[in-house]
């Protein structure tokens, strides 16, 4: 903890500097600089507050120990002992919380995301389940105060989704949804099953951070643009003109389709933004093999036996196989109440990080 304490002392000094800068008229007048400073302050605020509470508790314990050592007032001594017992528990909890807050940050945690959901093994039932997952994430996003827009989708005749790509924007979206990557398995009786037998199907979910203002120039000659009619989930955005846009970056084979905006021009602009992000990610991965491996690791193959989570409808049960978490709340989870699952995953992976840091210390 000594090394962490030294870092915290430096962090507190920097935090105080930032607070002074935020009151500086010159900084306030520079909008870009001011936004950078306020973001840095917000990122540091919680850990600095906990560190200050930690130090205050330590000082209070030291004061109580003096009362105990003096021993002249038995009643005060007893009160000091009780206070110190409570403060020691609080300090222990603060230490754990501070360690987690000081873990290396995932640079993508603050980013918005593109989420791709695909029906995998199981035919029509897999496509219906893909639609259920789409609605689950839309409701969860709504609960978080995030915004969701459909980037591209392909529906099936039974009302499910062969694939759906959505953009979710808001506060720390990637940090919450990055653990949703993988194959999701459903066990239930399909509506088409007359014998009432439980079937197993899967859908895959891929979560990719959306890079902002990517510094990459794409040669227009290397991009094929196709336009077609929107065919989304229905509603007022669907029109009879060829407003949907599909862009293919020929050197990498990366394809982006966009149909959620109201005009072809808007779809072109958004598709180009996403394409730049994907191509940037590709080149950051250095080559096609690494890029493909990253995406495969994210979603798996969609095979029934390869799953991160199982949704068992007859038993109203959801099991996350990575952490051994089972909740008999499937109805609530499918209605977007994912916090309990996501919080458990976050704690699990943070604990693993702490263990790895301890081993390498």
From Swiss-Prot:
Record note on modification: Methylated by PrmC. Methylation increases the termination efficiency of RF1.
Modified residues (N5-methylglutamine): 236
Gene Ontology CC annotations of this record: cytoplasm
Entry keyword Cytoplasm: yes
Principal location: cytoplasm
Pfam families: PCRF, RF-1
Keywords: Cytoplasm, Methylation, Protein biosynthesis
Transmembrane region(s): none
Source organism, top-level taxon: Bacteria
Family matches, as InterPro entries: PCRF, Pep_chain_release_fac_I, Pep_chain_release_fac_I_sf, Prokaryotic/Mito_RF, RF-1
GO MF: translation release factor activity, codon specific
Cell location: Cytoplasm
Cleaved signal peptide residues: none
Family of this protein: Belongs to the prokaryotic/mitochondrial release factor family.
Described function: Peptide chain release factor 1 directs the termination of translation in response to the peptide chain termination codons UAG and UAA.
The protein's name: Peptide chain release factor 1
Organism: Lactobacillus delbrueckii subsp. bulgaricus (strain ATCC 11842 / DSM 20081 / BCRC 10696 / JCM 1002 / NBRC 13953 / NCIMB 11778 / NCTC 12712 / WDCM 00102 / Lb 14)
Highest classification ranks of the organism: Bacteria, Bacillati, Bacillota, Bacilli, Lactobacillales
Gene expressing this chain: prfA
């Amino acid at each position: 903890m000594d090394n962490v304490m030294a870092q915290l002392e430096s962090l507190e000094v920097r935090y105080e500097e930032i607070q002074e800068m935020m009151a500086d008229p010159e900084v306030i007048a520079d909008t870009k600089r001011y936004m950078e400073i306020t973001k840095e302050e917000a990122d540091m605020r919680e850990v600095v507050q906990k560190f200050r509470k930690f130090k205050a508790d330590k000082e209070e314990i030291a004061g109580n120990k003096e009362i105990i050592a003096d021993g002249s007032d038995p009643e005060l001594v007893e009160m000091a002992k009780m206070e110190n017992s409570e403060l020691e528990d609080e300090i222990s909890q603060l230490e754990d919380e501070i360690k987690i807050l000081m873990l290396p940050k995932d640079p993508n945690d603050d980013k918005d995301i593109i989420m791709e959901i695909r029906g995998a093994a199981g035919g029509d039932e897999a496509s219906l389940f893909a639609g259920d997952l789409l609605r689950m994430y839309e409701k969860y996003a709504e609960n978080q105060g995030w915004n969701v827009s459909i980037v591209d989708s392909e529906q099936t005749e039974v009302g499910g989704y062969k694939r759906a790509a959505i953009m979710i924007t808001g506060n720390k979206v990637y940090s919450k949804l990055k653990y949703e990557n993988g194959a999701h398995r459903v066990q239930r009786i399909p509506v088409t099953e007359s014998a009432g037998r439980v079937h197993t199907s899967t859908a895959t979910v891929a979560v990719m951070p959306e890079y902002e203002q990517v510094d990459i120039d794409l040669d227009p000659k290397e991009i094929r643009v196709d336009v077609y009619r929107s065919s989304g989930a229905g509603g007022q955005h669907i029109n009879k003109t060829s407003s949907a846009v599909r862009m293919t970056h020929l050197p990498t084979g990366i394809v982006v389709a966009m149909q959620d905006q109201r005009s072809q021009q808007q779809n072109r602009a958004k598709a180009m933004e996403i394409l730049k992000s994907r191509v940037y990610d590709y080149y950051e991965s250095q080559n096609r093999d690494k890029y493909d491996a990253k995406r495969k690791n994210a979603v798996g193959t969609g095979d029934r036996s390869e799953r991160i989570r199982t949704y068992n409808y007859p038993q109203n049960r959801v099991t996350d196989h990575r952490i051994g978490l089972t909740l008999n709340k499937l109805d609530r989870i499918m209605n977007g109440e994912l916090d309990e699952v996501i919080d458990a995953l976050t704690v699990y992976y943070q604990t693993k990080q702490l263990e790895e840091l301890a081993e390498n210390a």
